Swiss-Prot record:
Gene3D superfamilies: 3.30.465.10, FAD-linked oxidases, C-terminal domain (3.40.462.10), Uridine Diphospho-n-acetylenolpyruvylglucosamine Reductase, domain 2 (3.30.43.10). Its cofactor is FAD. Belongs to the oxygen-dependent FAD-linked oxidoreductase family. The keyword Secreted applies. It is found in: Secreted, Extracellular space. It catalyses: N(6)-dimethylallyladenine + A + H2O = 3-methyl-2-butenal + adenine + AH2. This is Cytokinin dehydrogenase 6. It comes from the Eukaryota. The gene is CKX6. It is an enzyme of class 1 (oxidoreductase). Residues 1-35 form the signal peptide.
Amino acid sequence: MSYLHASLLRKRTMLIVRSFTILLLSCIAFKLACCFSSSISSLKALPLVGHLEFEHVHHASKDFGNRYQLIPLAVLHPKSVSDIASTIRHIWMMGTHSQLTVAARGRGHSLQGQAQTRHGIVIHMESLHPQKLQVYSVDSPAPYVDVSGGELWINILHETLKYGLAPKSWTDYLHLTVGGTLSNAGISGQAFRHGPQISNVHQLEIVTGKGEILNCTKRQNSDLFNGVLGGLGQFGIITRARIALEPAPTMVKWIRVLYLDFAAFAKDQEQLISAQGHKFDYIEGFVIINRTGLLNSWRLSFTAEEPLEASQFKFDGRTLYCLELAKYLKQDNKDVINQEVKETLSELSYVTSTLFTTEVAYEAFLDRVHVSEVKLRSKGQWEVPHPWLNLLVPRSKINEFARGVFGNILTDTSNGPVIVYPVNKSKWDNQTSAVTPEEEVFYLVAILTSASPGSAGKDGVEEILRRNRRILEFSEEAGIGLKQYLPHYTTREEWRSHFGDKWGEFVRRKSRYDPLAILAPGHRIFQKAVSYS
């Protein structure tokens, strides 16, 4: 009888616990529903120049990575900076009783939901871009342009070229917003010389997580200025930026050569980025694995210096390394530059029969990736999953990394480029939030693979993600000491490890400028505290 009594007691206890759990969850759900209803009502009452969209919001629930989909409560289309500040200040004043968060979205080129927020507010930053770009000090040694944080770099190029000027540092793809690239770093082949884009900013206007509008420079509000640059949107939203300019060339001499040996390829790259006087203006490189017909495709836009030898070059599936160079030209110095280029190339160790050159307009060179985008869109191959992996690898470990990754883990590069090139750490400002390896020279390794939707094979998302994990695991086991660029982690411990010595400063800045963790929740670094009482 005692056993039967105990069994009935356990069942009754379980029933009570289950009932209480259901009641508690129902109360929370009811509370959340009331909160959402209250949030919508209060947001609709905000005096905005622009507007909040509550119905057609699905376009803001995906990004270029095409792997995450978080549906927001609303999308803000700001027509003024005060629209952004008022919205954030309103959420800040609601305190922990609101679970609303805010994500700034430019072109949605994030890879893993970083510009998304579930049941929060996405700010469509391009709504700010109609503000006119202002170019200043055109005839001075230090010209600059003031632009909206939602402005596209391609538009900045078009406008500044009217004055014979252009920004010094770029990204490979120009159809991105200023605020988006400055929140990360902004790297391309000019970075060895000028540093990333975050090293070429004079001033910022920021809306903090409290809804404050602050102007900042290296001297004014310098803590916020340094924190926001490379800060992954955690401390504020960039609404305006002052970008350094330089005289723009008219043409570009564009060069590609091939190597069979990675060590020789890397040695030449390092020699070029350290050369006195910087003999080239742009230096990148990429890895070619299992690609057939490559040189034939180059002949569509490049000219072989030795066409017969180039046509006879056979690599039979071997891994190749392409060094890509550019020298800026003006009509009055073209012959001199061509001679300098010839002399510099003679010092390099590439396969001599694989020298390909062309001359293109400066604008066409900078916007070269957009040409590929147009082609991929026409084939329905642009809006596919992009499980990219971007790494910063210290110089002392790059050969070991190449042997392990390019020699074993990667089997082909037909579904996207693998970019490899070195930069000088001295051109990066260590006071910013951007994280790099400790060595003076480190490499960007960008494995930019596109996945085939629905594929379960080697071109499928899961297989590519498995390969990415293998690369990271190999690097960890080999002690490579790399850092992720455009990082994605899921735990506080991983973020702490990523930031290293900068973690304490990062947390302090978050507490100061966005203490409720309202901003940029898609990075999953900080969790917003919510009270259900």
